C-alpha cells in the first residue's frame, strides 16, 4: 500500500527486499541497499544494542522512526485450535515457536507467556529460521503457537487449515498478568482486536499490541 502511494503521488518505484528476522531486516538499511525498513519491536533493541544487536558487529544503532500505526489488529500468540488451548496458562507444556535472530518475536512471545507466569522453561521451544517458517510449522503440526499480528497472511492460512486458530486473551483487568507482561515487553499495551484471523467486530478478543510496523531509517538519512 505504501509502495502504491509513493508511485501514485511521487512517481517513485519501490522494490521490496524480503527478510526473515530483525537482523536481516536492518542489514540492507545499514549497508545502503535500502532506504527504509519495516521493523517490529526489533528496532527498539537495535537502538539500545540489545540481544542480537548487542554483538560487537552491531551495538547501538542510530535508527529513527518515520511512520507507524495502531489499528484494529493486535499482536499476540496465535495458537492451533486443535491444541485445546483456551488461555495463555494452557500453553504450559505446548510447543511454542521461536525465530533464530529475531529478538522482537522472541521477546514478544516471552512477554505473552509471562502474562500467565510462564517462561520458556514451561513450554517446548521449537526454533525456526524465519517468521514464515514458524507459522507454516503450525499448519504442518510441528508447533502449536507462534507470535504474530492477527491480520498476517500466515495466520489466515492457519485459520483456513484443518488445525484452525485461536488467540488466548490477555484481559486488561488482570493487573498482575499485565505487570508481568510489561516487565518483559514494556512497549506492549492492552488492545481490543476487532479484525484478523478468527476475529471480527462481532467477535473481538482482548489482546495486546504496539505500533506496528515501524518504518525505520538511520538518523543520517532523515
Stretches found by the model and what they are:
Residues 11, 21-24, 31-34, 60-61, ...:
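Extracytoplasmic
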Residues 7-10, 25-28, 44, 57-59, ...:
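Extended interaction regions within the primary functional domain
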Residues 36-75, 114, 166-181:
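Conserved hydrophobic/amphipathic secondary-structure segments
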Residues 3-4, 15-57, 85-86, 132-137, ...:
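Pocket-flanking alpha-helical
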Amino acid at each position: 500500500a505504501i509502495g502504491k502511494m509513493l508511485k501514485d503521488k511521487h512517481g517513485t518505484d519501490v522494490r521490496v527486499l524480503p527478510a526473515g528476522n530483525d537482523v536481516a531486516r536492518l542489514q540492507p538499511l545499514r549497508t545502503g541497499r535500502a532506504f527504509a525498513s519495516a521493523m517490529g519491536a526489533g528496532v527498539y533493541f537495535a537502538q539500545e544494542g540489545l540481544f542480537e544487536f548487542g554483538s560487537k558487529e552491531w551495538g547501538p544503532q542510530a535508527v529513527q522512526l518515520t511512520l507507524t500505526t495502531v489499528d484494529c489488529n493486535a499482536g499476540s500468540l496465535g495458537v492451533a485450535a486443535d491444541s485445546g488451548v483456551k488461555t495463555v496458562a494452557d500453553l504450559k507444556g505446548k510447543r511454542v515457536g521461536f525465530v533464530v535472530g529475531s529478538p522482537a518475536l522472541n521477546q514478544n512471545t516471552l512477554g505473552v507467556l509471562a502474562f500467565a507466569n510462564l517462561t520458556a522453561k514451561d513450554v517446548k521451544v521449537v526454533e525456526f529460521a524465519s517468521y514464515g517458517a514458524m507459522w507454516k510449522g503450525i499448519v504442518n503440526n510441528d508447533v502449536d503457537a507462534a507470535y504474530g499480528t492477527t491480520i498476517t497472511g500466515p495466520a489466515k492460512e492457519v485459520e483456513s487449515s484443518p488445525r484452525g486458530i485461536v488467540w488466548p486473551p490477555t484481559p486488561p483487568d488482570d493487573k498482575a498478568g499485565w505487570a508481568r507482561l510489561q516487565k518483559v515487553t514494556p512497549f506492549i499495551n492492552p488492545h481490543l482486536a476487532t479484525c484478523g484471523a478468527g476475529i471480527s467486530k462481532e467477535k473481538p478478543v482482548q489482546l495486546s499490541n504496539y505500533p506496528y510496523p515501524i518504518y525505520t531509517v538511520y538518523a543520517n538519512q532523515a
